[in-house]
Amino acid sequence: MTNSNRIKLTWISFLSYALTGALVIVTGMVMGNIADYFNLPVSSMSNTFTFLNAGILISIFLNAWLMEIVPLKTQLRFGFLLMVLAVAGLMFSHSLALFSTAMFILGVVSGITMSIGTFLITQMYEGRQRGSRLLFTDSFFSMAGMIFPMIAAFLLARSIEWYWVYACIGLVYVAIFILTFGCEFPALGKRAPKTDAPVEKEKWGIGVLFLSVAALCYILGQLGFISWVPEYAKGLGMSLNDAGTLVSNFWMSYMVGMWAFSFILRFFDLQRILTVLAGLAAILMYVFNTGTPVHMAWSILALGFFSSAIYTTIITLGSQQTKVPSPKLVNFVLTCGTIGTMLTFVVTGTIVEHSGPQAALLTANGLYAVVFVMCFLLGFVSRHRQHNTLTSH
């Protein structure tokens, strides 16, 4: 593989995470405006975003097998066509059914693209370099989470319709589409090089179960938290801009944390530092949820920084539970995380409807505590140390 080709594939991976981050995180900013657009209460409107999350979940789950049937480049180019159709559907229709369909299509495109992006990184990089590359790739998720709420706040404050936010997000996929030209992708399945030796099948082990539960609870907790921070902040008397700033600050700190931890993680055992970070994140979220508005800005910055490496480290540890990284194993952990994404508004929408936004934030806090327990238990069964020892000889 040429260096320029590797760079293009790496940038496709970066942008695939930015696309998913933008679609998922901007929801909290535009939800109120979309609810007004369709004359629905916010708690009811939040349920329609389950179609976005369901699309992500289904596509990531199926793509573990589709990647071996449909070439990666073909998937990405077809995804561009679907993205154009979905954004056009949002812009030119006032039907709630079509809105839900467009959201589902956006989810499918996002899930396919992100699973391809994750696979490319695990395929091109090995060992500790894989972990730091995955962490840097995931930083584009939070970079989009920092940039697009600011774009949304800018557009909405000027009474520009909410669907233009999704048109802006579509530009990320335009860049991915352009990068596919003149770029060679790894061949899988029947198109894979015949010289490759057959890979011996390995049992995944109970560590994968702990990591999968941790991935689900972490994503459900994180998105359940950040999706309702704007409503919670507005309930405390903050303006829409100030609420948007809280979300942007979280993702800015998250992004900086990823860059920092992509260097720091090289010096620590991944399972041990993951347990410490999960415990710290649970404590900091509790401080935010029970603190005063004066301290919210600082606690959300600290939470963003110290929780930034958790999800990517879970994926990296998952890929290290077998001697040879398995696309199906990585996709399984990703799928569990995406189940958390899909359940976000199913779980939190009901909680907010009955008990208000703070109850959703406290539920997210409980889920972070579960992540800590799973990471602690992983220490007794993880295989990453023996596999790292084998690869270092």
From Swiss-Prot:
<feature type="transmembrane region" description="Helical">
    <location>
        <begin position="332"/>
        <end position="352"/>
    </location>
</feature>
<feature type="topological domain" description="Periplasmic">
    <location>
        <begin position="32"/>
        <end position="50"/>
    </location>
</feature>
<dbReference type="InterPro" id="IPR011701">
    <property type="entry name" value="MFS"/>
</dbReference>
<dbReference type="Pfam" id="PF07690">
    <property type="entry name" value="MFS_1"/>
</dbReference>
<feature type="transmembrane region" description="Helical">
    <location>
        <begin position="361"/>
        <end position="381"/>
    </location>
</feature>
<feature type="topological domain" description="Cytoplasmic">
    <location>
        <begin position="266"/>
        <end position="272"/>
    </location>
</feature>
<keyword id="KW-1003">Cell membrane</keyword>
<feature type="transmembrane region" description="Helical">
    <location>
        <begin position="134"/>
        <end position="154"/>
    </location>
</feature>
<keyword id="KW-0812">Transmembrane</keyword>
<dbReference type="InterPro" id="IPR023528">
    <property type="entry name" value="MFS_TsgA"/>
</dbReference>
<keyword id="KW-1133">Transmembrane helix</keyword>
<feature type="transmembrane region" description="Helical">
    <location>
        <begin position="162"/>
        <end position="182"/>
    </location>
</feature>
<feature type="topological domain" description="Periplasmic">
    <location>
        <begin position="353"/>
        <end position="360"/>
    </location>
</feature>
<feature type="transmembrane region" description="Helical">
    <location>
        <begin position="273"/>
        <end position="293"/>
    </location>
</feature>
<feature type="transmembrane region" description="Helical">
    <location>
        <begin position="101"/>
        <end position="121"/>
    </location>
</feature>
<feature type="topological domain" description="Cytoplasmic">
    <location>
        <begin position="183"/>
        <end position="205"/>
    </location>
</feature>
<feature type="transmembrane region" description="Helical">
    <location>
        <begin position="51"/>
        <end position="71"/>
    </location>
</feature>
<feature type="transmembrane region" description="Helical">
    <location>
        <begin position="297"/>
        <end position="317"/>
    </location>
</feature>
<feature type="topological domain" description="Cytoplasmic">
    <location>
        <begin position="318"/>
        <end position="331"/>
    </location>
</feature>
<feature type="topological domain" description="Cytoplasmic">
    <location>
        <begin position="122"/>
        <end position="133"/>
    </location>
</feature>
<dbReference type="InterPro" id="IPR050375">
    <property type="entry name" value="MFS_TsgA-like"/>
</dbReference>
<dbReference type="InterPro" id="IPR036259">
    <property type="entry name" value="MFS_trans_sf"/>
</dbReference>
<feature type="topological domain" description="Periplasmic">
    <location>
        <begin position="294"/>
        <end position="296"/>
    </location>
</feature>
<protein>
    <recommendedName>
        <fullName>Protein TsgA</fullName>
    </recommendedName>
</protein>
<feature type="transmembrane region" description="Helical">
    <location>
        <begin position="11"/>
        <end position="31"/>
    </location>
</feature>
<keyword id="KW-0997">Cell inner membrane</keyword>
<feature type="transmembrane region" description="Helical">
    <location>
        <begin position="78"/>
        <end position="98"/>
    </location>
</feature>
<feature type="topological domain" description="Cytoplasmic">
    <location>
        <begin position="72"/>
        <end position="77"/>
    </location>
</feature>
<feature type="transmembrane region" description="Helical">
    <location>
        <begin position="206"/>
        <end position="226"/>
    </location>
</feature>
<feature type="topological domain" description="Cytoplasmic">
    <location>
        <begin position="382"/>
        <end position="393"/>
    </location>
</feature>
<keyword id="KW-0472">Membrane</keyword>
<feature type="transmembrane region" description="Helical">
    <location>
        <begin position="245"/>
        <end position="265"/>
    </location>
</feature>
<feature type="topological domain" description="Periplasmic">
    <location>
        <begin position="155"/>
        <end position="161"/>
    </location>
</feature>
<dbReference type="InterPro" id="IPR020846">
    <property type="entry name" value="MFS_dom"/>
</dbReference>
<dbReference type="GO" id="GO:0022857">
    <property type="term" value="F:transmembrane transporter activity"/>
</dbReference>
<feature type="topological domain" description="Periplasmic">
    <location>
        <begin position="227"/>
        <end position="244"/>
    </location>
</feature>
<feature type="topological domain" description="Periplasmic">
    <location>
        <begin position="99"/>
        <end position="100"/>
    </location>
</feature>
<dbReference type="GO" id="GO:0005886">
    <property type="term" value="C:plasma membrane"/>
</dbReference>
<feature type="topological domain" description="Cytoplasmic">
    <location>
        <begin position="1"/>
        <end position="10"/>
    </location>
</feature>
<comment type="similarity">
    <text>Belongs to the major facilitator superfamily. TsgA family.</text>
</comment>
